[in-house]
A protein has these predicted regions:
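An aromatic- and histidine-rich active-site surface loop
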Residues: 97-118, 122-131
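Conserved donor-binding/catalytic core segment of Leloir-type glycosyltransferases
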Residues: 3-7, 211-227, 233
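A short, charged, and often flexible helix/loop element on the N-terminal side
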Residues: 57-83, 136-143
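A short helix/loop element that forms part of the nucleotide-sugar donor recognition site in Leloir-type
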Residues: 196-211
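A short beta-strand/loop micro-motif in the catalytic core of glycosyltransferases
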Residues: 157-166
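Nucleotide-sugar donor phosphate/pyrophosphate-binding loop at the beta->alpha transition
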Residues: 77-81, 119-121, 129-154
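Carbohydrate-associated surface elements
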Residues: 168, 189
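N-terminal subdomain of nucleotide-sugar transferases
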Residues: 1-64
Length: 233
């Protein structure tokens, strides 16, 4: 049976779009007969044991706490996670290392995979440097922005295969000169079985708030420019 070790920024029991997508990927893999295990980096800040099982999924933690200056701290994060990956891999014996963005996880997974002689795949859910610009925590063209992009370019170039969450990310990577033949689309999806049987439309409520009889699109999420809500509207 194939075993895949997933390298993650954070995971369940924390709740975020990131952790819910991770859960869906791991659960679908299990349904396909693939054994899965995860390890999180230093940015998983929830309190818990070194090894934690949540919803039938096992996650190893990287407990190192760092206080070095920027850039040095990020490299220490990579090395701490790399060491954790190698430790788990030597015990659990995975067949593939699958790292999920950000690039810090990608570089840690890449370095560990090369040292262990294992196949390495990288999944990009967003360009985190652009997300930082969108939410106001970063600026385009800054040193941090350029270093983050350079690091991710390195990971993408060296990965055996790359997954992106949408065609826009794939097209961007190809425009940078990366091989499009190794970049595969892995979009978000919805497992309708998790929702049971939805209740019938409440016509009284719809009328009271002026919705009318047409279709209704609801959005639950963050209100950042990069979400594309203006396009939806």
């Amino acid at each position: 049976m194939t075993r895949v070790l997933h390298i993650l920024d954070h995971s369940l029991p924390l709740h975020s779009g990131y952790t819910f997508r991770t859960r869906a990927i791991l659960k679908s893999s299990q349904s396909a007969g693939i054994e899965v295990c995860g390890i999180t980096g230093n940015r998983h800040l929830a309190q818990g044991p070194p090894v934690e099982t949540v919803d039938g999924l096992t996650f190893h933690r990287t407990a190192t706490r760092l206080s070095s200056p920027p850039i040095i701290r990020e490299w220490q994060e990579i090395e701490a996670l790399r060491a954790g990956i190698e430790r788990v891999a030597k015990e659990w014996r995975p067949d593939i290392i699958h790292a999920h963005s950000p690039a810090l996880c990608g570089m840690a997974g890449l370095r560990a995979a090369h040292r262990l002689g294992m196949p390495f795949v990288y999944e990009i859910r967003a360009f985190w440097e652009d997300a930082a610009v969108g939410n106001g925590t970063g600026s385009e063209g800054s040193i941090k922005y350029r270093l983050t992009r350079a690091l991710e370019n390195r990971v993408v170039a060296k990965a055996d295969a790359v997954f992106t969450i949408c065609n826009g990310l794939r097209d961007d990577l190809v425009s940078r000169g990366h091989d499009g033949n190794k970049i595969v689309l892995s979009p978000n999806g919805v497992d309708l079985t998790l929702f049971g049987h939805p209740p019938a439309r409440d016509e009284t409520l719809a009328a009271s708030i002026g919705i009318g009889s047409g279709p209704v699109i609801g959005f639950i999420g963050s209100f950042y420019d990069y979400e594309g809500l203006d396009d939806l509207i």
